[in-house]
């Protein structure tokens, strides 16, 4: 069944999806897939929610913009779950933490929801969902292999 916001069908997305907020960033990421943007398949553009599927080193991968904030991100992720996506990797910018430099990589072990949508989804109780350790290890290894200063640990998410 097509999803109401993404207008996508099962099979449109790879099991692994990169999630930038900015639609322009989604297009820039898809342009780095094997064969560039021309080889990527545009799978969603409804409501400005740009999504592409392609490959990276022969491995299927998708990128899907979430726009800004936890409410829209939760809608996009729920629809992607309905379409069979199993791994979500948030990429892009973030609010500031002391001691971090511009261009540093942050690999989140868990995300504590402090207010707003995270509180609603957690039933008003504090939650700290944790990331899959194999994914964390792969992200840390790739980040360091690319020479990035890499920070690993819990993060806080808030949309208020």
Feature-to-residue mapping (PLM):
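Metabolite-binding pocket within alpha/beta catalytic cores that recognizes anionic/polar moieties
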Residues: 1-138
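Active-site rim beta-loop-alpha module in soluble metabolic enzymes
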Residues: 129-160
